Amino acid sequence: MRFYIGLMAALMLTSILRTDSASVGQTGTKSELALIERVIRQRDAADVKPVARHNDGPGRDPAPCCQHPIETCCRR
């Protein structure tokens, strides 16, 4: 009888420890993803460099234009 009680207590303790470690891992994963997304956004913002347009003829605007594909900072 003591064996079964000890076995049940060990199983309950193991299941409690598993759920605690799983919840810590999930919150850690969310914060890690947020950190990675922030680093990527900062890197993308730093990669935006103005590049001079080709001034082929009269009437062309020689203002710098961003290379970033998402940004629309090229005004015509």
UniProtKB/Swiss-Prot annotation:
Comment on protein domains: The cysteine framework is V (CC-CC).
Subcellular localization, as worded in the UniProt entry: Secreted
PTM info: Contains 2 disulfide bonds that can be either 'C1-C3, C2-C4' or 'C1-C4, C2-C3', since these disulfide connectivities have been observed for conotoxins with cysteine framework V (for examples, see AC P0DQQ7 and AC P81755).
Signal peptide interval: 1-22
GO cellular component: extracellular region
Keyword Protease: no
Classification of source organism: Eukaryota, Metazoa, Spiralia, Lophotrochozoa, Mollusca
Positions where 4-hydroxyproline occurs in the chain: 50, 58, 62, 64
Single GO MF annotation: ion channel regulator activity
Keywords for this protein: Disulfide bond, Hydroxylation, Ion channel impairing toxin, Neurotoxin, Secreted, Signal, Toxin
Organism: Californiconus californicus
Family: Belongs to the conotoxin T superfamily.
Propeptide: 23-42
Protein name: Conotoxin Cal5a L2
Tissue-specificity statement: Expressed by the venom duct.
Function text: Probable neurotoxin with unknown target. Possibly targets ion channels.
Entry keyword annotation includes Disulfide bond: yes
